[in-house]
């Protein structure tokens, strides 16, 4: 017997409500397959060329603002069983040229599959928090701007942790870290896309609408880099090369999480990445 699956929503966003005993997870992207089946490197190169042709903003001495709306599946072991909860978050980073800045983060109450799980939950129950720091008071992925050439960007993103090579998943994860803290002008976006185009495992999945209602092209790679087989995806604006979203989806097994695969465990929507003064 197949259990029914419905939808729930909050603040204009939706997620799946799962059958009893199964935690809620964000809905999968509905992807329209590409018509021509052209290889991912070619599609990315064309998007990169369009991004590079856009006028560059004056960035010297300017403040960056990065706004992210995200959904995370959290797990907690209690009494020998795993409790999973879906939590929506919003994060607004303001980063000034001298390195000082502010993060305003808000977390909505976690969603549980039962009241019993809610009572057992010992982690964050939501709320808002503002963090400020002076120049030099916070570490970032890199204190310098991302380079606009592929060779320099490859070195910029490299990190000496296993595996000790800049593989496809490590590259995408490093890009994600930068996107969470930097506004990328067109030249830097183009370099990101051209570096992505070098990854041999990367696939062009097709076209999809993100959770903010924007259309973009989906590029993915499959890997068990984090321990479980998963799909790592970016959603890109085909006209500007802007990164619209990031998704991490378990593909074949949920491990200890009480979810049904395929299951999205992380979805981040990059709502704003601009220079504001």
Predicted regions and their residues:
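Intrinsically disordered, low-complexity prosegments and terminal tails associated
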Residues: 4-277
């Amino acid at each position: 017997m197949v259990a029914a699956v419905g939808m729930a929503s909050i603040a204009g966003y939706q997620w799946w409500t799962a059958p009893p005993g199964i935690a809620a997870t964000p809905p999968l992207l509905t992807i329209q397959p590409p018509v021509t089946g052209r290889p991912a490197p070619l599609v990315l190169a064309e998007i990169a060329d369009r991004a590079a042709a856009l006028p560059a903003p004056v960035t010297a001495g300017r403040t960056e603002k990065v706004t992210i709306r995200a959904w995370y599946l959290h797990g907690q072991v209690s009494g020998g069983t795993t409790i999973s909860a879906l939590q929506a978050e919003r994060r607004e980073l303001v980063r000034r040229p001298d390195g000082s800045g502010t993060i305003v983060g808000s977390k909505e109450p976690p969603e549980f599959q039962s009241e019993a799980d809610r009572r057992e939950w010992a982690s964050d129950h939501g709320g808002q928090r503002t963090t400020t720091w002076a120049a030099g008071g916070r570490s970032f992925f890199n204190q310098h701007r991302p380079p606009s050439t592929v060779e320099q960007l490859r070195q910029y993103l490299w990190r000496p942790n296993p595996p000790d090579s800049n593989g496809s998943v490590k590259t995408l994860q490093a890009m994600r870290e930068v996107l969470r803290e930097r506004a990328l002008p067109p030249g830097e976006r183009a370099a990101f896309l051209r570096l992505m185009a070098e990854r041999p495992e990367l696939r062009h999945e097709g076209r999809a609408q993100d959770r903010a209602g924007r259309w973009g092209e989906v590029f993915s790679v499959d890997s068990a880099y984090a321990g479980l087989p998963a799909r790592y995806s970016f959603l890109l604006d085909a006209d500007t090369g802007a990164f619209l979203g990031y998704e991490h989806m378990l593909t074949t097994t949920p491990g200890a999480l009480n979810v049904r695969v395929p299951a999205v465990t992380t979805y981040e929507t990059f709502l704003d990445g601009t220079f504001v003064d």
